[in-house]
Amino acid sequence: DFDQVGWPACGELDILEMGNAGGFSSPNKAAAYLNGACHWGPSWDKHYCYGPSTTLNTSLQDGEFHLITVTWDEQYIRCYANYGTATQEKYYEIDVTKVDFSDNTVAGNYFKKPFFIIFNLAVGGNFPGIWDINQISALNADNNYEAKMYIDYVKVYQKK
């Protein structure tokens, strides 16, 4: 319902975010430092976010594909890296059970409806804390000043 209510009232689920300023401050952990996040609220100036960061036991920047999974039911939204494998790790969970339309801070008010999927590769701005294009380390001579994201496939399953 983005066209009808706008952001953040439409709700936003960031399944995987990497490149956070916190990861850059711990260079030996940067390749495994990530988070999921949910954003909601009635307006820009009353925007709420829950997106704790974590460090995985394995790197997602090892040149291999990784299975990133979201499970979303009536109670929780959960995000996993390497789902269904020996190295599976849950890195995000938010409780969306409660619904109370008299309280616009309640996350459950915004996550009980269909969503659409966007893939976004950002290399500067608020999240990494980089404002000067010359300081963006993701763009360099080694990669011909190009940032790339490779997605092998996307599957969506839904209960009837």
Q: Which sequence ranges carry the predicted segments?
A:
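GH16 jelly-roll
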Residues: D1-K160
